[in-house]
Amino acid sequence: MDRGMILDIPAWVCRSPRGRVATGINSYEEAVQGTYINNDYFMSNRNGNCKFLNVLQGENHAEADDWYSRMKKYCDPKQYDMPFEGWAMGGQNMCDIHLILRRLVELRHDGLLEKGLHDWMHFLGTSKLEWATLLTDIQRAVRKYHNENFTISFDCASPFLASANGQIYIQTEITDREKWVYRMVPSVDDKKYATDTRRFGDAVLQDKVFESFTESPISRRIEIKDICIYAPGDLNKIGKEGRTSWDSFSYAIQMGHNVWSHLNAVQEANRQYDQGIVPKMLVQETFDRVYFKDVVEAIFATSDKGEALAIIEDFSKFWIQIIGTRGAIGKKTVNASAMFSNLFEEEVDEADNHHQDDSGLDDTKLDELEQAE
């Protein structure tokens, strides 16, 4: 393994009934202390074969700042002979561009974004297509002005959640000054296709199952009967006739198609962005036309920390329109969320913290698929 994350305990688990049962964590402070224990174990037992990413958590700006101030030592070569080699952004750090930019400036001036030491930053659960271009802008700016090796990566479960929920990617929609999406729709599931030898893409378009369909290398090589396996009267592997025409491999094939489609969408989004096609959320046209990439360039072009932070604050209204995966942004996370957390105890399900671009996806379906195997 080249890189991996340490075993953090996210701040949100204390507000989740299932999270509390699974971890025994009942407060933010307990999550911090538990992460200390795990970080210390990783630090004491590592052999250097894997570069570890220090995970930053926190559900609002106040918690995120506190978490960073307490956990940043694990990446500090002045404190450890073999410090962690990069960062992973969780909680509010993964979806709030205001917080992300401020954290990057602090990392730079704390000496914790250095070439050869802290070359990698990973964003957890990042599913919005616009963020593929936004993170590219940040990576380019950091490489240009500070660390030429700096690399950003991100993950999301959308392709797998889509399949588990019976959905398939059919097209990518990239239009200038509009919302960018990879379109998911309910996939074909009909026992009448169990002996149909037409190619999958041909069948779904000829029969108007989908209005459009962008092929993948996988979909080009399958027939529709490879997805709709069971005919009327066929028994499944537990000896019963089910309602679906799919077997477990039907899900696997479509997951492969969805993964390719998602990766292709990310690549195409960056290609179009470099040609001047811009998503609505990354340009501010209320008064003067302001592009996200130009503001990011200005933030990292200056070597003065105070000036960089001032630029970030000057564009605080711009950041509010840039919506992250979880949707909580701007002043609500700086003020209202922090105050609410201080005054009330709220119970949430952890699924809410892995909210995908398609809000209808149910992440428990993946568990059901695994248990069915």
Describe the predicted segments one by one:
Residues 47-217:
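Glycine-rich phosphate/ribose-binding loops and adjacent secondary-structure elements
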Residues 28-31, 35, 64-71, 100, ...:
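Generic structural signal of hydrophobic/aromatic residues within well-ordered alpha-helices
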